[in-house]
Amino acid sequence: MDNLIQKMSEIYSDLHNSNNLIHCLTNAISINDMANAVLSIGQSPFMADNPREVEDVTRKSDSLLVNLGNITDYRIESIKKSVRIANENNIPITLDLVGVSASKLRLDLTLDILKNHTITCIKGNYSEIKSLFIKDLSTKGVDSQKLEVDDVINCCKNLHEKYDSIIVATGQTDIVCANEIYLLNNGDDRLSKITATGCVVGSLIACTLSVSQSIKACVLAISMMNISCEMVDKSVGLSSFKLGLYDNLSRIKWEQIKENIDAKKVES
């Protein structure tokens, strides 16, 4: 764990000494929250999704986020263009599998992207990761089914071996898997009562990957989000909780992350 903490400290420092351009191809439901999250940790969001401009924007970016929520034909065209440009220019890509467990269109798009391109990080909740692993739909909605952690770890390991991507599975325990596996147990149940918080995690991962294309960068991004929400007063309502989360994201110090992180490395 000492190596994890040391590397996360370096990534945190690099992140806060940078102002990288993060190209987010996302949905109308989460776009504002994601842009604010990127800004809150000192990076610059660019939310372009017009197929006529995305190649130029991606080419200038330091990281690309592809979010499959509320997908449209228009954005599918943009996604395919941006992913190609990112690969050609060694720009890290975070692919957030929003809704792939409920939509054949999204699952087929994901499989097509993974067949033809290299993805730095594949992120989804337990159900979405399981659906990608079995290549089939598994639920009527976008929230996780009650899957066992060990089952999801097995899915993550197999997906990492197949696609050589960092795999992030979010749930009660967050799983981050590459050549090593970390279980993260920070967080707050209130996150599940606010829309787009999972999408925000994806945008934070895109930010940390812009300075380090590593599993530790993903652990840092998730921990920043989860520890920030833990620091919000337990007595406040959901609107105040959301505001407090963004306040904490913008002010969280490395020492707070180091002191509060609940991470466990498991045998891979």
Curated annotation (Swiss-Prot):
GO terms for biological process: thiamine biosynthetic process; thiamine diphosphate biosynthetic process. It comes from the Bacteria. Keywords: ATP-binding, Kinase, Magnesium, Metal-binding, Nucleotide-binding, Thiamine biosynthesis, Transferase. CDD domains: THZ_kinase (cd01170). Substrate binds at residues 47, 196. SUPFAM superfamilies: Ribokinase-like. GO terms for molecular function: ATP binding; hydroxyethylthiazole kinase activity; magnesium ion binding. InterPro entries: Hyethyz_kinase, Ribokinase-like. Its cofactor is Mg(2+). The keyword ATP-binding applies. The keyword Methyltransferase does not apply. ATP binds at residues 123, 170. Pfam families: HK. Pathway: Cofactor biosynthesis; thiamine diphosphate biosynthesis; 4-methyl-5-(2-phosphoethyl)-thiazole from 5-(2-hydroxyethyl)-4-methylthiazole: step 1/1. Its EC number is 2.7.1.50. Transmembrane segments: none annotated. It catalyses: 5-(2-hydroxyethyl)-4-methylthiazole + ATP = 4-methyl-5-(2-phosphooxyethyl)-thiazole + ADP + H(+). It is an enzyme of class 2 (transferase). HAMAP family: Thz_kinase. Belongs to the Thz kinase family. Catalyzes the phosphorylation of the hydroxyl group of 4-methyl-5-beta-hydroxyethylthiazole (THZ). This is Hydroxyethylthiazole kinase. The lineage of its organism: Bacteria, Bacillati, Bacillota, Tissierellia, Tissierellales.
